[in-house]
Each structure stands twice: as C-alpha cells, then as structure tokens.
Regions:
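Short, glycine/charged-enriched hinge/interface segments at domain edges or termini
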Residues: 1-71, 75
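Short glycine/threonine-rich loop/turn motifs
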Residues: 44, 50, 54, 68-203
Length: 204
C-alpha cells in the first residue's frame, strides 16, 4: 500500500492506482528451503593429490549459509565421461543441488560443461554477463534438480555469479535464461576492498 497525503482524494484516483498495481503483489518473499547438495570437484591434479582442494571448502561454506547440507564430495578427475558418471552418482545420493567445480574455461581439458550436458541436464545457460563468473553454467534435470558448473573465481572472489544465483536456488525459484541475461546491468563487480556485498550495486 501507499500513504495518501491529502485529507481528501477523488475515488477514481484510488481506483486508477489499484488498476495500475494489478492483481499480483509488488513484492513476494520466498523462504529458503532446507536442501542437500553434492559437490563434484573436477581436475586430475586434485584427484591425484598434486594440489590441495581449496575450492570445496568455499562452496561448502556458502551452501551452509543457506542451510544447505553437503552430502558428498567426489573427485572424478578430467574427461567428459568421468564428470558425467560422477554427476550421475551424485544424483543417486539424493542430493537436491549438484555443484561441479573446476574445468569451466575454454582449455582443451576443461570438460565439465560437456560432462554436465552428457549427464542429461537441460542447459539453461553456459556463460553469464557477470564478472566475476562469466563461465558459469546452469542446468536442470527433468525432476527439477539444478546443476551448476562453477568457474574458478568462486574460490577466491568476494562475490560472484554463484552468490547471485544461490539464493534463488535455495528458495526453489527456477532460474531462467532471461534472468541471467538481465544481470548484465549491474553485473560487474568493482572488487572493493573490503567487500561489502550484498550492500552494493553488484547484481542489482
């Protein structure tokens, strides 16, 4: 509603305001739904133990902030088949959100997008007009389970495309390609130090 300033106002003006507002509410609050997640940490170096997995702890913490419990973490290495099989196994755990880390760039051995597609997901977008996070992937399975391919920036940047999408996923609101495209306005993080997100223009 809106406060009417004058003591008296013509009724037709109130009727016009109601008509302009329409039947739908101007704002809708959707609660976060307690969910479970599975993380597929790709990359042969991580699987072989040549480098430490510093990506998973970051993702796990971001999920926990929304009450999302991580059920499993797997290390399939590289290769489209390996990633696809790992995603299929992650789905079998009953996880309601699937997250793949690493292998999202354009290098020849970056096979995560292909693995996600081969696993049967309907790809909503591979790429986003957002920095950090341009190489983000989002898809859905037929049962509504979301799957995301997270670019490396999620590991070290204060706020990324993942931080913009995750609240919607946590509230069970389907994320569309049109909405991802709309993030192009306000989609450049200025990298402020210290980071004040979400109290900043990023993603708004």
């Amino acid at each position: 509603g809106m406060r009417v300033i004058p003591l008296i106002i013509a009724e037709e003006k109130l009727d016009a305001a109601k008509a302009a507002a329409g039947e739908e509410p101007l704002l809708e609050l959707r609660p976060w739904v307690r969910k479970t997640a599975a993380i597929v940490a790709t990359g042969s170096e991580v699987k072989k133990g040549l480098i430490q997995d510093t990506f998973t702890p970051v993702v796990r913490d971001k999920l926990a902030a929304y009450g999302i419990e991580t059920l499993s973490v797997t290390y399939p290495g590289d290769g489209v088949e390996n990633v696809a099989n790992a995603v299929a196994e992650a789905r079998q755990t009953g996880a309601e959100v699937i997250l793949c880390t690493g292998g999202m760039s354009v290098d020849p051995d970056d096979n995560t997008p292909g693995g996600i597609k081969q696993s049967g997901a309907r790809i909503v977008t591979y790429g986003a007009p957002v920095l950090p996070g341009a190489m983000f992937l989002l898809g859905y399975y037929d049962d509504g389970t979301p799957v995301m391919g997270l670019p490396g920036c999620v590991m070290y940047a204060g706020a990324t495309i993942f931080d913009l999408v995750l609240p919607w996923v946590a509230a069970d609101v389907p994320v569309t390609r049109d909405w991802i495209v709309s993030l192009g306005e306000g989609g450049l993080c200025l990298g402020c130090k210290p980071c004040h997100w979400p109290a900043c223009p990023f993603g708004k």
